[in-house]
Amino acid sequence: MAETPKTILIVDDDRELVEALRTMLERHGYRVMQAHDGHQGKQAIYNQRPDLVILDMMMPRMGGYPVLEHFRGKTDAPPIIMITANEGSRHKAYAEWLGVVDYIRKPFAMERLLEAVQRGLQGDSAKEAPAQDEKE
């Protein structure tokens, strides 16, 4: 019997990026859902129970940090990968303190994100991963 595909929620207001990520993830056997701001993302996390979330930091209405703050420390929260165009190391440190499994700066190689997704689903954090995009 085939294993049920893992569900990934992408929360990002950049529709082109969301479609590119959707295509790549579906090609690798994942089921993909999407939300376009933090409010929609929070609702989808509660209602759809994704296995992993890819979360943008900067979005209209509600960005990624309030979502991270809301789910911080909750044992039933899915692993979250934050993606951002922000270069600040303080932002990365705060996101890590809030519990992200990885923090990836845009633009990024799709392979980099796919590796982070695979590690996140296995329960491994970015701390064990090679830091190839560390431009502090």
Model-derived features with residue positions:
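Active-site beta3 strand of CheY-like receiver
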Residues: 48-54
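Acidic catalytic/metal-coordinating carboxylates
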Residues: 36-40, 62-67
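Alpha4 helix (beta4-alpha4-beta5 surface) of REC/receiver domains from two-component response regulators
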Residues: 66, 87-102, 115
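Short amphipathic alpha-helix used as the core "switch/output" element in two-component signaling
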Residues: 43, 65-76
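Charged docking surfaces used in two-component/phosphorelay signaling
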Residues: 19-27
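Receiver (REC) domain active-site loop signature in two-component systems and cognate sites
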Residues: 59
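Non-catalytic signal-transmission and effector/linker regions of two-component phosphorelay proteins
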Residues: 1-7, 111-136
